[in-house]
Amino acid sequence: MQIGWAIVVFIVCLVVIFFAADFVLDGIEELGEIWKVPTIILAYILIGIDLEETVASWSAALNGLPHIAVGNVIGNTIISICFCFALPAIFFEISFQKIRKWIMLSLPVFGLWIILYLIFPQLRIVFGILAIFSYVGFVVINIVSKDPLKATEFEENEEEGENKVSEAERKYLKKKIWKPILLFVIGIVALYFASEWLINSTHDILNAVNIDEGVFGLIIIAAGTNVEEYMLLFKSIKRKTPEIGLGGLIGKIIWNNGITFGVSLLLMSAPSAIPLSILINGILFVGVILPTLIIISLNYKKLNWKSSIPLLTLLCVYIVFSFVF
């Protein structure tokens, strides 16, 4: 494949992945409304689960590109923290008051599995399983420990809604359910094929211009699939519900470092030596960026233009390291 055509395919696939993920999320959202799914579950499904990043990393792992799979997770997480958090904070103050402390303190657990994998890649199966179980534990704790008042309120509203729903409305809802299911299926199929072509075009570009695959995964793919996160946080801030966008970003970080990373380790073949660029950026992420975010959220309990400066500075350091090493 000529490099010009490979670049076109790469760009088209990114666009398809972006919109296909919207199809999936729209479908799940409508299903949640029809089935009266609790808000906390909807938040994880609609916002926290990062389908395009997951599919891209898993496809990379299956296609013999383990460094892109892992680099994509690290790069996406660094950009989510240093850019998706910091950019809106330049214009609006973001409060962490409604984010429970233990959620922020759980982030280093996921970072630990990444660092251990980078040091001992031969134990990838062990660290992959630990990352997956860490995410499952995170979800279970959230469901079990949710606010009893909110749970009671939801149950009461659900009972009232059931009493008010007529037989005609029930039939209408049964017909309506096919639309979100169709959206979901179309989105999943489009995501699968677009991700396959994305990885193939990536491989062709790497071969043509001799770009290190770790650098490519860390910056280009990771940056290109974060557009919806920027818009989500901006909109939630303008609607005076910043905890929705903030919770979505945190959920995405935990999903990618738990499920996306963990399953990628299980799918990939034995990797060669870890590239220096990925190792350095992994240390930067776990040893510097995560502690900075945790300190800001727990000590200052808000993110504004002043506290966003350290994160933006770390983003610049990350980009420089990615190209230098």
Question: What are these model-derived regions, one by one?
Answer:
Residues 1-325:
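Hydrophobic alpha-helical segments, chiefly the membrane-spanning helices
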